[in-house]
Curated annotation (Swiss-Prot):
It catalyses: alpha-D-xylose = alpha-D-xylulofuranose. It comes from Serratia proteamaculans (strain 568). Belongs to the xylose isomerase family. It is an enzyme of class 5 (isomerase). Binds 2 magnesium ions per subunit. The active site is at 101, 104. This is Xylose isomerase. The gene is xylA. One of its GO terms (biological process) is D-xylose metabolic process. Its cofactor is Mg(2+). Its EC number is 5.3.1.5. SUPFAM superfamilies: Xylose isomerase-like. Mg(2+) 1 binds at residues 232, 268, 296, 339.
Length: 439
């Protein structure tokens, strides 16, 4: 097989003093952090779609990249060539996992029959590639949003035949994910929303997608899939409003359909930005609700109202995220997937490496800062002190349901309560955070 990235053997850790742009400066996979290898903490994955499927096009311009597998030709032959390049990239980047949508790896074809045939062929190819390279599948998913049939959604479509086509894709992608040893299966409702309420029945669409998710859970248990099911929240784009708006919205949906113990969330940083939240907020909310699963590590531009999918470069932002994850015990089946793409002007094929190397170094630095925060314990102590009253007799009686509203009012009056405001010490804690970051 002819090498595509023929000027590079493999990316390795060379340390912070190295001037080699094709080396890791902070990500040392074997370095121990809190007693665990850095690679095991971070569980990096590269994505198939932005890295190998995007051609550099945007709403105002055609594709700017010269990718041999994106040229005219036999679709399956080109898909196999793309797989060759993808796994060469995964190996040379030294990344342990990858992620895909069904039509990232396989031509959709002109019919459902062709789709099923092509995906079966490419599942065989991926299985062989994983075996020979040692690269594993973090998660698979089905693209039920790009084709025109999904213009009005997939599970929320007004036509049950479109719903059925989407069900076939998810059924097939779940089976492929299980066969390939995928540790999770993701459901992103790219067009599960609306553009106008003038032609939308909200109750009907909610019932449809609720039943769809129940079917997915039923299939998981029927087949014995051991991975985690994940929903990926996003507030809008491409629709005006999406039903999986943010983590809290997804939790409400899961509770409505009795799925809160079955499905967790895959949180993307850029989607948090679009929802008006910090990345930190969405991670902390998911952990608090018991539905944290995995992360799409990227960044958005707060000055732009769309999904820019840039590589993460903020150690400060991601240290807070990794702090929450470490406090919660770390990843189980999830990991850090780089749902990020090089810029349209980044036309050198090695720009793919520069983007991922910088992101991996950023997350490694963030992990080390988060580990200092955990070990030092000052933030934990400050928060514990702030809520200490809830561990006392009054707080415990309230939480345990031993006091009614009337009884509590009588207690407050009888004890002549006159609580005094206590400083939240935000500025002090922000200064402490800077010391963790910069020494």
């Amino acid at each position: 097989m002819q090498s595509y990235f023929d000027q590079l053997e493999q990316v390795h850790y060379e340390g912070p003093t190295s001037n080699n742009p094709l080396a890791f400066h902070h990500y040392n996979p074997d370095e121990l952090v809190l007693g665990k290898r850095m690679a095991e903490h971070l569980r990096f994955a590269a994505c198939y779609w932005h890295t190998f499927c995007w051609n550099g096009a945007d709403m105002f311009g055609v594709g700017s990249f010269d990718r041999p597998w994106q040229q005219p030709g036999d679709a399956l032959t080109l898909a196999k060539r793309k797989a060759d390049v993808a796994f060469e990239f995964f190996h040379k980047l030294n990344v342990p996992y990858y992620c895909f949508h069904d039509v990232d790896v396989s031509p959709e074809g002109a019919s459902l029959k062709e789709y099923l045939h092509n995906f079966a062929v490419m599942t065989d190819v991926l299985e062989e590639k994983q075996h020979s390279s040692g690269v594993k599948l973090l998660w698979g998913t089905a693209n039920c949003f790009t084709h025109p049939r999904y213009g009005a959604g997939a599970a929320t479509n007004p036509d049950p035949e479109v719903f059925s086509w989407a069900a076939t894709q998810v059924f097939t992608a779940m089976n492929a994910t299980q066969r390939l040893g995928g540790e999770n299966y993701v459901l992103w409702g790219g067009r599960e929303g609306y553009e106008t309420l003038l032609n939308t029945d909200l109750r009907q669409e909610r019932e449809q997608i609720g039943r769809f998710m129940q079917m997915v859970v039923e299939h998981k248990h029927k087949t014995g899939f051991q991975g985690t099911l994940l929903i990926e929240p996003k507030p809008q784009e491409p629709t005006k409003h999406q039903y999986d708006y943010d983590v809290a919205t997804v939790y409400g949906f899961l509770k409505q359909f009795g799925l809160e113990k079955e499905i967790k969330v895959n949180i993307e940083a850029n989607h948090a930005t679009l929802a008006g939240h910090s990345f930190h907020h969405e991670i902390a909310t998911a952990i608090a609700l018991g539905i944290f699963g995995s992360v799409d590590a990227n960044r958005g531009d707060p000055q732009l109202g769309w999904d820019t999918d840039q590589f993460p470069i903020s150690v400060e932002e991601n240290a807070l995220v990794m702090f929450e994850i470490l406090k919660a015990g770390g990843f189980t089946t999830g990991g850090l997937n780089f749902d990020a793409k090089v810029r349209r002007q980044s036309t050198d094929k090695y720009d793919l490496f520069y983007g991922h190397i910088g992101a991996m170094d950023t997350m490694a630095l963030a992990l080390k800062v988060a580990a200092k925060m955990v070990t030092d314990g000052q933030l934990h102590q400050q928060v514990s002190k702030r809520y200490a009253g809830w561990n006392g007799e009054l707080g415990q009686q309230i939480l345990q349901g031993k006091l009614s509203l009337e009884a509590l009012a009588q207690y407050a009056e009888g004890h002549a309560l006159a609580p005094q405001h206590v400083s939240g010490r935000q500025e002090q804690l922000e200064n402490l955070m800077n010391r963790y970051l910069f020494g």
